[in-house]
């Protein structure tokens, strides 16, 4: 097959070979005929690159702004601290809004090329990170890409980054069920990759967030992705002065607990809206060693996650 046109819908799309962008493409007859479609060669490359990565965990959210990237960072920090003999990687596939370089304190770092591929940026002795944020000329640069180009970038991150031996790779995704999700699932749901991908879904207590979380759960079920559980973020506000908690987002329909019962998925736990966490996210500081209600709740969530892998 020759190189696809710029706005190619992708060889696995139901519209492959049928949309206007396909007109004149030398591969149109192949893509439009289901009997002639070829397996994406990227799948074999991804399987080879991830052969030493034991577990893959998608961090998902149906709604934007629920703190999915923050939860990804907190999970990574706590797991790395509590399991110093294990190695963890973070892959930021929120192509248009990469947050992990800021959250993990790696803004301004550069990705280096070696004989075995891109070297992810080291965060701690047992944590590394890859993000498109490291490839931009400025943190303010906008990424204006259509689906096929995002798909190509994700394939590169999965197949051309030298992840080495990892016990867990956490993938921070954009909200919704968009091109990025379909791409990463198509590459990770592969019989050649052991211990295939699982998912954690992040929400807040109010119904406007839970509506989209239900869609995300159904997406996982349709794609055959096991759901480790749901994390309810910003479940309450913890005052930094008196330590008392109050509801910011009222759970008028029962919050994540009721939704998990309804959808038959586990509730991993709840995290409060803590000013210390907000400050740490802006500075890239690790505060998981502190003793407070937030880190205690985080510890319980991480224990349930690790138990699910065992």
From Swiss-Prot:
Binds 4 [4Fe-4S] clusters per heterotetramer. Contains two stable clusters in the N-termini of Nubp1 and two labile, bridging clusters between subunits of the Nubp1-Nubp2 heterotetramer. ATP binds at residues 62-69. Pfam families: ParA. It comes from Drosophila willistoni. GO terms for molecular function: 4 iron, 4 sulfur cluster binding; ATP binding; ATP-dependent FeS chaperone activity; iron-sulfur cluster binding; metal ion binding. [4Fe-4S] cluster 2 binds at residues 239, 242. It is found in: Cytoplasm. Component of the cytosolic iron-sulfur (Fe/S) protein assembly (CIA) machinery. Required for maturation of extramitochondrial Fe-S proteins. The Nubp1-Nubp2 heterotetramer forms a Fe-S scaffold complex, mediating the de novo assembly of an Fe-S cluster and its transfer to target apoproteins. One of its GO terms (biological process) is iron-sulfur cluster assembly. This is Cytosolic Fe-S cluster assembly factor Nubp1 homolog. GO terms for cellular component: cytosol. The keyword Signal does not apply.
């Amino acid at each position: 097959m020759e190189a696809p046109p710029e706005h190619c819908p992708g060889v696995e799309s139901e519209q492959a070979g049928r949309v206007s962008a396909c007109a004149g493409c030398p591969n149109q007859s192949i893509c439009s005929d289901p009997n002639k479609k070829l397996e994406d060669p990227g799948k074999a490359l991804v399987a080879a690159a991830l052969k030493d990565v034991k577990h893959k965990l998608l961090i998902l959210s149906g709604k934007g702004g629920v703190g999915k990237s923050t939860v990804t960072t907190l999970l990574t920090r706590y797991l790395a601290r509590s399991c110093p003999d294990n190695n963890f990687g973070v892959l930021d596939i929120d192509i248009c809004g990469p947050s992990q370089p800021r959250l993990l304190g790696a803004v301004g770092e550069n990705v280096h090329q070696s004989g075995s591929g891109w070297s992810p940026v080291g965060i701690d002795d047992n944590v590394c990170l890859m993000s498109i944020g490291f490839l931009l000329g400025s943190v303010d640069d906008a990424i204006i890409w259509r689906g096929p180009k995002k798909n190509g970038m994700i394939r590169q991150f999965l197949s051309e980054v030298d992840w080495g031996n990892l016990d867990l790779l956490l993938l921070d995704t954009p909200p919704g069920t968009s091109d990025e999700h379909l791409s990463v699932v198509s590459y990770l749901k592969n019989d050649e990759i052991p211990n295939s991908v699982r998912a954690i879904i992040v929400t807040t207590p109010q119904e406007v967030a839970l509506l989209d979380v239900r869609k995300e759960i159904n997406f996982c079920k349709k794609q055959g992705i096991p759901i480790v559980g749901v994390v309810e973020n910003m479940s309450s506000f913890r005052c930094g002065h008196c330590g008392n908690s109050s509801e910011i987002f009222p759970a008028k329909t029962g919050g994540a607990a009721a939704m998990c019962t309804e959808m038959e998925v586990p509730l991993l736990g709840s995290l409060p809206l803590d000013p210390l966490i907000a400050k740490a996210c802006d500075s890239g500081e690790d505060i998981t060693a502190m003793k407070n209600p937030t880190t205690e709740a985080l510890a319980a969530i991480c224990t349930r996650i690790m138990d699910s892998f065992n």
